[in-house]
Amino acid sequence: MTARDTQKQWRVLTAKVGLDGHDRGVKVVSRALRDAGVEVIYAGLRQTPEMVVEAAIQEDVDAIGVSLHSGAHMTLIPRILELLKQRNATDIVVFGGGIIPQDDARELKKLGVVEIFGPGTSLQSIIDFVNHGFKAA
């Protein structure tokens, strides 16, 4: 038995929220997480916050990973947090990635997002965060 065998298998919903069609990054991250033993549910492109939260609750995930490159992060991610609160699902952790300025990332963290991954973040950093970090956040 390895150390990984004694850890919980995390369930993470990944999604592209809004009208952004740039999905290569979220697919690469989703596959890397899956290959690292994380159960990944990829919701797909052009998801609304309502669709993401509904899927997250139905799939009983531990976390939502949101990818945004459209500049709508300060509208869409807070909406996801609001909907989670309305549905009494604040135990679902939210993290994000994409082109998100550092000032906005700090503001999103104040609102409850546990981490924002920017361009150039290594896949191993994201895997380590999911396997070890987000439940401690």
Positions of PLM-derived features:
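A glycine- and charged-residue-rich anion-binding loop/surface
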Residues: 18
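The C-terminal output helix
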Residues: 131-137
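Intrinsic disorder at enzyme termini
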Residues: 1-2
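Nucleotide donor/acceptor-binding cores
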Residues: 10
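Cofactor-cradling patches in redox/metallo enzymes
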Residues: 26-131
